[in-house]
C-alpha cells in the first residue's frame, strides 16, 4: 500500500517540476526577448540580402519632408515624433548623408510636404490627415506666395539649407498625403536616368514607406537609411518599428548612415580611378 500510494505522489512531484521548469524557462526567455532592443536586427536573418550595389551615375538621394514641423523641437509635431527623431539621431545623420551625396556627385532630390488653405477644406480625411491639419503642419498661405514662409514649420531645417539651396538640388512639387503619385519626383528621376534611390526622411511608416513602395512598383532599386528616418510614437503604435519591419521585407537595402556614407565614398573613389 505504501508503494502504491507513493506513485501518485511521485507523479505529482514530477508534474510540478515540469510545470515549474517550463514556466521558468518561458519567463526567463520572455525576459531575455523583452530585453533585446526593439529595433535590433535578427541575429540570423531568414531573408536573403538583395546585394544592392551603387552606381553613382544612376543614383539619387531622395529626402522626404526635411522640414521644421517634422524634425525640430520647434516643430508642430515634436510632441509625437521628437522621441524617435532623437533616438535615431536623425538631423545629424541626414546632414552626413547630404554632405556625402554632394561630395560623391549624386543627384539630390527633396520631396516636400505643403498644405494650402484649400487643402483644409477636404470633405473626408484619414486619421493622420486630420491630425496634421489640426496641428497646422506644413501650412503655407498659398501655392503662389512665400509670404509667412520664412521661419515657419513648412520651411526646411536650417542645417540642411546649405545643401538644398546650392542651386543643384531638385525640390519637387509637394506630395499631399504620403506617396509621390501626385508630385513630379518620378518624372525628375526618370529625366536624369536615375534608377537607384537612397531614401531617407520622415515619417518612416507614412511618407517614406509610401515612397518606397511606389518606387519599387515602378522598377527603381531602393535602399532605405534606417537611422535617417523616424516616426511618431502613439498609443496606437510605434511608427518606426512598423516601418522597419516592412523595410526589411521589401527594400533592396536597409543601411545605416555609416554604411551609406561608406558606400558613397567608396564608389566615389572607384569612379575617380576610372
Question: Residue spans of the language-model regions?
Answer:
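Bacterial N-terminal signal peptides that target proteins for export
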Residues: 2-19
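A short alpha/beta connector and helix-capping loop motif
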Residues: 57-59, 75-101, 106-107, 112
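Active-site loop/turn elements of alpha/beta-hydrolase fold enzymes
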Residues: 66, 113, 227
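Short, well-ordered beta-to-alpha junction loops that form the rim of enzyme active sites
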Residues: 111-114, 202
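Short catalytic/ligand-binding loop motif for oxyanion handling, primarily in non-cytosolic enzymes
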Residues: 116-120
Amino acid at each position: 500500500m505504501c508503494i502504491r500510494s507513493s506513485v501518485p505522489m511521485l507523479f505529482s512531484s514530477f508534474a510540478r517540476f515540469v510545470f515549474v521548469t517550463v514556466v521558468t524557462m518561458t519567463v526567463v526567455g520572455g525576459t531575455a526577448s523583452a530585453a533585446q532592443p526593439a529595433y535590433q536586427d535578427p541575429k540570423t536573418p531568414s531573408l536573403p540580402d538583395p546585394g544592392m550595389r551603387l552606381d553613382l551615375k544612376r543614383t539619387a538621394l531622395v529626402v522626404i519632408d526635411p522640414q521644421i514641423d517634422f524634425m525640430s523641437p520647434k516643430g508642430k509635431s515634436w510632441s509625437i515624433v521628437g522621441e524617435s527623431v532623437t533616438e535615431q539621431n536623425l538631423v545629424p545623420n541626414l546632414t552626413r548623408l547630404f554632405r556625402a551625396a554632394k561630395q560623391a556627385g549624386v543627384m539630390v532630390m527633396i520631396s516636400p510636404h505643403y498644405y494650402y488653405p484649400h487643402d483644409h477644406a477636404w470633405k473626408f480625411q484619414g486619421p493622420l490627415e486630420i491630425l496634421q491639419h489640426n496641428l497646422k503642419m506644413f501650412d503655407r498661405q498659398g501655392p503662389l506666395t512665400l509670404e509667412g514662409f520664412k521661419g515657419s514649420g513648412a520651411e526646411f531645417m536650417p542645417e540642411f539649407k546649405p545643401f538644398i539651396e546650392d542651386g543643384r538640388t531638385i525640390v519637387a512639387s509637394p506630395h499631399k498625403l504620403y506617396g509621390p503619385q501626385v508630385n513630379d519626383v518620378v518624372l525628375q528621376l526618370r529625366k536624369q536616368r536615375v534608377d537607384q534611390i537612397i531614401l531617407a526622411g520622415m515619417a518612416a511608416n507614412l511618407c517614406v514607406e509610401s515612397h518606397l513602395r511606389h518606387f519599387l512598383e515602378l522598377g527603381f532599386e531602393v535602399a532605405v537609411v534606417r537611422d535617417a528616418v523616424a516616426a511618431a510614437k502613439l498609443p496606437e503604435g510605434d511608427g518606426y518599428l512598423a516601418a522597419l519591419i516592412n523595410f526589411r521585407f521589401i527594400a533592396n537595402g536597409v543601411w545605416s548612415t555609416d554604411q551609406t556614407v561608406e558606400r558613397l565614398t567608396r564608389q566615389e573613389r572607384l569612379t575617380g580611378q576610372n
